[in-house]
From Swiss-Prot:
It comes from Petromyzon marinus. Heterodimer of a B chain and an A chain linked by two disulfide bonds. The gene is ins. Disulfide bonds join C12-C43, C24-C56, C42-C47. It is found in: Secreted. This is Insulin. One of its GO terms (cellular component) is extracellular space.
Length: 57
């Protein structure tokens, strides 16, 4: 899986949403593509599982 390790990976669009489902699980997450936060961090640059956890509810 692209999520292994903390080195980081590029995740965009549906791949990013899917990764958030995996990382956040039952907690859920907030994903607002209009706000650049997670897209900027994970799509334009690289982010890790630990970065994504910041977007869980």
């Amino acid at each position: 899986s692209a999520l292994t390790g903390a080195g980081g990976t590029h995740l965009c669009g549906s791949h990013l949403v899917e990764a958030l489902y995996v990382v956040c699980g039952d907690r859920g997450f907030f994903y607002t593509p209009s706000k650049t936060g997670i897209v900027e961090q994970c799509c334009h640059r690289k982010c890790s599982i630990y970065d994504m956890e910041n977007y869980c509810n």
